[in-house]
Amino acid sequence: MNAVATAQDGIVFTLDGAIGVATFYIGDSPYAIVTANDQDSVQVIDLRDPSSPVAAGIAVDGERNFTMLERARGVATFTINASIFAIVCGRSDDGVCICEHLPTALFY
């Protein structure tokens, strides 16, 4: 096993307290969605070039109708009629957030 790349919290990525990850595909393109427990957020990462991951979108608790992401933890993805969704646990909100249209629904 070899590490081919890393992504770290900072200017481009919002990953402080990264704790959960799920992957999904749009066509042939792989993506990951990562929960950031300490930043009450989820980050979508474009993995088309595994040696150079690209931030593709973010959702933060309290912004743009995202109200259940405080202390975001677990995440899973699923597909209904070709639409991709993520369900994220918001530990401190005692709830879940269901996000659709990944990654285009999540912006900077």
Positions of predicted regions on the chain:
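Feature marking well-ordered beta-strand scaffolds used for ligand recognition
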Residues: 1-108
